[in-house]
């Protein structure tokens, strides 16, 4: 482990020497090229994952079962559903869709980048001397608070997709009447043999957290959109203040 840390220290030193020549760039000047690229990839992959998740959550054609359609109309986009011959007595058989697999893959990729950045930035924040004491406090507090929030939501979302298996939740109409939990985030309400889905408390919490994190990361995506250039960002900020 010490050899790995020594090697990372050597790499970081070289990166900072190069970055010092480009000090006008906001992220690159502080964290180096590798961490900046990983951070950008994380923001991008998480943003796409979160938007896809919200599209699936707010999909209007949700779980619907009644005497008229004798089947299932839509299923969130997350899963593929196999319609049984006897809809009211047979099990619902469904598997994760390509849409769900894409979210699952992006979520795992985002989680990997978050863990990687947490380790890399721990070295930069607590071992390196290129940043001041107050920068260390601000960056460490803000970043590791973000790490907990992001990882918690990604873990919830991954569990939601993985636990769609029949073994975890009931799959017949008889069972759904006594146990309305269709999945980790959704419950089933029924009236006169018409079944419809609603977000449960955990699903509502996960959705609210997802929206909050997306809004939180928008300013950071904006900084990357301006090429991380401090002078350009400062000029825009000063122009707005004068107006």
UniProtKB/Swiss-Prot annotation:
What is the membrane topology listed in the Swiss-Prot or TrEMBL record?
Multi-pass membrane protein
Cysteine pairs bridged by disulfides in the record: none
Which compartment or compartments is the protein found in? Cell membrane
Keywords for this protein: Cell membrane, Membrane, Transmembrane, Transmembrane helix
Q: Name one GO cellular component term.
A: plasma membrane
Where are the bilayer-spanning segments? Answer: 38-58, 99-119, 143-163, 204-224
Annotated protein name in UniProt = Uncharacterized protein MG323.1 homolog
- Which organism encodes this protein? Mycoplasma pneumoniae (strain ATCC 29342 / M129 / Subtype 1) (Mycoplasmoides pneumoniae)
């Amino acid at each position: 482990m010490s050899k790995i840390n020594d090697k990372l220290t050597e790499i970081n030193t070289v990166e900072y020497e190069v970055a010092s020549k480009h000090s006008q760039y906001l992220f690159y000047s502080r964290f180096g090229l590798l961490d900046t690229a990983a951070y950008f990839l994380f923001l991008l992959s998480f943003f796409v994952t979160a938007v896809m998740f919200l599209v699936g959550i707010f999909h209007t054609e949700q779980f619907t079962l009644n005497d008229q359609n004798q089947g299932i109309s839509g299923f969130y986009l997350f899963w593929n559903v196999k319609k049984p011959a006897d809809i009211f007595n047979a099990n619902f058989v469904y598997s994760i869709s390509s849409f769900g697999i894409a979210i699952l893959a992006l979520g795992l990729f985002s989680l990997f980048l978050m863990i990687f950045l947490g380790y890399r930035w721990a070295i930069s924040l607590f071992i390196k001397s290129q940043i001041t004491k107050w920068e260390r406090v601000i960056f460490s507090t803000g970043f590791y608070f973000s790490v907990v929030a992001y990882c918690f939501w990604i873990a919830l979302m991954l569990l939601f997709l993985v636990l769609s298996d029949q073994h975890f939740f009931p799959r017949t109409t008889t069972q759904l009447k006594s146990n309305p939990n269709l999945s980790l985030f959704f419950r089933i309400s029924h009236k006169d043999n018409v079944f419809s889905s609603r977000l449960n408390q955990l699903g509502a919490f996960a959705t609210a957290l997802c929206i909050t994190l997306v809004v939180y990361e928008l300013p950071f995506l904006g900084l990357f959109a301006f090429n991380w250039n401090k002078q350009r960002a400062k000029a825009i900020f000063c122009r707005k203040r004068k107006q």
